[in-house]
Design a protein with these regions (language model features):
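N- or domain-start disorder-to-order transition segments that initiate the globular core
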Residues: 1-26
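Internal, well-ordered alpha/beta segment that forms a basic, Gly-enriched binding/recognition surface
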Residues: 94, 98, 133, 138
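Short, flexible active-site-proximal loops enriched in glycine and acidic residues
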Residues: 83-89, 103, 119-125, 142-146
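Scaffold signal of the M16-like zinc-metallopeptidase fold and its non-catalytic homologs
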Residues: 62-67, 113, 138-166
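M16/MPP (pitrilysin/insulinase) zinc-metallopeptidase core fold and M16-derived inactive scaffolds
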Residues: 27-109, 159-165
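Acidic/histidine-enriched alpha-helical segments
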Residues: 117-136
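Short beta-strand/turn micro-motifs at beta-sheet edges
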Residues: 15-18, 82-85, 150
């Protein structure tokens, strides 16, 4: 029988634990409710700050590639994960991994990485180049651009989560 339960930590983080006995894999996904449609945030002093479009997408890459222990994907690969990635949507950013073995070791590395990021200007510049490359590739994808233009005509909220190259 499948079971789901929510746990709320002292810091307010809510965790959903869902057990599905029909699966042989373990899936962990962490969501932050900060995505491509967010252009401001509230700092620890309660002040609202403006940010550039694409910031959530840039942070998605930055966090994944620059933990205090290095690249999160590379660190998890050592434990034979099935896959690992991050993604930015309009309303949220998520990070995940799937594994069959070494679940607790992978979970520890994953959480340590996500919550312990190493910031520097050089790392930020390198990450920006990767994001610019992704934006350029997206602009050159004719099929996606046709779909995006069609969706633009159907919906009023039509911002890309990738951001721009500016």
């Amino acid at each position: 029988m499948n079971k789901a339960k929510f746990i709320t930590l002292d810091n307010g983080l809510t965790i959903l634990i869902y057990t599905d006995k029909s699966k042989s894999t373990n899936h962990v996904e962490l969501y932050t409710f900060f995505g491509g449609n967010h252009y401001e945030y509230v700092d620890c002093n309660g002040n609202t700050k403006k940010i550039k479009p694409g910031t959530a997408h840039l942070l998605e890459h930055y966090v994944f590639e620059n933990t205090i222990d290095g690249n999160l994907f590379d660190n998890l690969k050592k434990y034979n994960i099935l896959n690992c990635n991050g993604g930015t949507n309009t309303d949220n950013t998520s990070y995940f991994f799937n594994t069959v073995i070494n679940f607790y070791e992978c979970l520890e590395i994953f959480l340590r990485g996500i919550y312990n990021v190493s910031f520097s200007k050089d790392k930020l510049d390198k990450t920006k180049m990767a994001v610019y490359s992704e934006i350029r590739d997206d602009k050159e994808n004719v099929r996606n651009n046709i779909i995006y233009r069609k969706l633009n005509n159907l919906f009023t909220i039509n911002r890309k989560t990738l951001g721009s190259s500016s």
